[in-house]
Amino acid sequence: MAAAAAAVAGAGRGGGGGADPGQERSRARSWVGAERSEGRRMEPNEELEEEDSPGGREDGFTAEHLAAEAMAADMDPWLVFDARTTPATELDAWLAKYPPSQVTRYGDPGSPNSEPVGWIAAYGQGYTPNSGDVQGLQAAWEALQTSGRPITPGTLRQLAITHHVLSGKWLIHLAPGFKLDHAWAGIARAVVEGRLQVAKVSPRAKEGGRQVICVYTDDFTDRLGVLEADSAIRAAGIKCLLTYKPDVYTYLGIYRANRWHLCPTLYESRFQLGGNARGSRVLDRANNVELT
């Protein structure tokens, strides 16, 4: 497994290689008995159908505004549990110390962090960052916009393939509180145990609003891999609506309410109680076709 963009890694496959969470920002905090700085980066966060700003606000903001806030979050320090360098036995203590509903985006004397935190993330043992040729992708995107040629989902897919920017992520949106913290703990454990490879969650915004958990896969064109990640997420106890977004949209700053009227999410997954064995129904949104 390998590959991806500002993302995480091959979810559900248990192999090495993987997306590059937000293209590995410049600073992060990793748990190795105590916090320490470590270079790395991931990706912005998302709303019910696309991405919200990491600040937590969802409505009335342009795609440009959301992209700017996402970039700011990527550049701030992250809280990271890295299973490649930290014993799995320390995970529970880390989760208890940094529940996402209490970690604040800009720091607060009463929260676990006194300084800004862009994201909280978990890296699996097989995680190897690989974001592809993001600079080449962005240059090709600029050229496409000035060429006057149509900009369609197919165009973006081909750009992503050409520049090997193939990662994507399942998005889980929850209000701050017990359900969010419980869901994040389940996802983080799945990462550390090797059932998923990389995930991150946004900190709590001053304005409130939902927070987002992003669970990454290596290749958005690999439908089987995307569905395997959905199954692993459901097995971790997640029952809410999931949506899936390729990182090419994030790298190019394409969020909801964008000027091209593109929908950045490819799939949605709905939990099915007592339904099929995999526990969810996944819809291909572009073609309105059920995949499971």
Curated annotation (Swiss-Prot):
Low complexity bias: where?
1-10
Task: Give me the stretches of Basic and acidic residues compositional bias.
Answer: 35-44
Q: Which cysteines are joined by disulfide bonds?
A: none
UniProt biased composition (Gly residues): 11-20
Q: Which SUPFAM superfamilies match?
A: eIF4e-like
InterPro entries assigned to the protein according to its UniProt record, in alphabetical order: Bles03, TIF_eIF4e-like
| Start and end residues of each stretch annotated as Disordered | 1-60
Query: One Pfam family for this entry, by name?
Result: Bles03
As for family, the record states:
Belongs to the UPF0696 family.
PANTHER family reported for this sequence = UPF0696 PROTEIN C11ORF68
Q: What is this protein called?
A: UPF0696 protein C11orf68 homolog
This chain's source organism reads: Rattus norvegicus
State the gene name recorded for this protein: Bles03
